[in-house]
């Protein structure tokens, strides 16, 4: 059905209206609508995470340089080394890039903590508008910033955009075929790769970072267009076929205590039901927290300390390459659900923690002889993180009832954000400790 009409008729914008469950449609889901929806969710994933990734890619530059006079950005493509701790054996900024990470994640954490309690009462369209406006505001504020403090305010706007968007769109997947989850995950991985690569490529090519950030204003507009004009109205879905067989073979996360029914949203779940569902989700939430804690401790705590002086890349360029390779790994693994499915995500958490331990030892002893070995490890780190994300949400979608799925997807969003927040809090004192070593 048409995009505008679909938006006006969207079931989700009238969540407070109780309607009788409609009959299930035939198993042959309309191919045109299916492709519009999966492409819509891919674009939503891409656009939702784009500003978040760009801010992390620019973290080293944001903390290294203030805006110069005139119309030039405070971030230079190849900045001279300033405000570093010259007494340390590391090439350190005075403030860890974890500060940007915290500005980019703490607002998201607050949003995700509060979302299961009341965000579902707000229709979806206003949430999407808030997300798009905040994303655009983040690019504008950082582009025209004269100080680190103002830039961090722009980073906070990017965090609000990403947090509201992720909770909104993952909850929205409950009303569409389960295939949209893998497409959403692939889109978020694509945001990482395209965001990091675009910032790296445009600044390396000599484009003013101010103009680079302003050129990205088309991304929030694309997100709004994808939601309002590309997605079709959600309809009751019949798992059917392979998905039905796979679901029936799984152990449900919680025992169903209510008669079989499929309400249009989870807004009528009691607090007791929400707590019961959340406890069942811990089997998947805890491993994902560990995965994201380890990888973002590496990314924002160790990346700037993994500095090789015997290469043609300066410190800022090395940091950008690290971010780009990590995001490339995330994109590949978040797009791999159709090829490889992992139920026991604890294995991924263990491997990522081993990754952290190995790189932490290298920061201390500097035994890796080449930056290219670090490149490979960072690519592998991204593969683990992306696989953990997509498989966690896929497993939750399979193992929760239709009645609980919308709430479960929104509640599980806290996993990555909590892990990232903890890593940022611990990376700050580690940075200060290591950078004061003579």
UniProtKB/Swiss-Prot annotation:
Keywords: Endosome, Glycoprotein, Lipoprotein, Lysosome, Membrane, Methylation, Phosphoprotein, Prenylation, Transmembrane, Transmembrane helix, Transport. InterPro entries: Battenin_disease_Cln3, Battenin_disease_Cln3_subgr, MFS_trans_sf. Residues 436-438 form a propeptide. It is found in: Lysosome membrane; Late endosome; Lysosome. The keyword Transport applies. A motif (Lysosomal targeting motif) lies at residues 242-244, 409-419. Glycans are attached at residues 71, 85, 310. A lipid is attached at residue 435 (S-farnesyl cysteine). Residues 1-29, 68-89, 236-267 are annotated as: Disordered. The modification Phosphoserine is found at residue 14. Residues 59-127, 173-182, 299-346 are lumenal. One of its GO terms (biological process) is receptor-mediated endocytosis. GO terms for cellular component: autolysosome; caveola; cytoplasm; cytosol; early endosome; early endosome membrane; endoplasmic reticulum; endoplasmic reticulum membrane. GO terms for molecular function: glycolipid binding; sulfatide binding. PANTHER family: BATTENIN. Belongs to the battenin family. Mediates microtubule-dependent, anterograde transport connecting the Golgi network, endosomes, autophagosomes, lysosomes and plasma membrane, and participates in several cellular processes such as regulation of lysosomal pH, lysosome protein degradation, receptor-mediated endocytosis, autophagy, transport of proteins and lipids from the TGN, apoptosis and synaptic transmission. This is Battenin. The gene is CLN3.
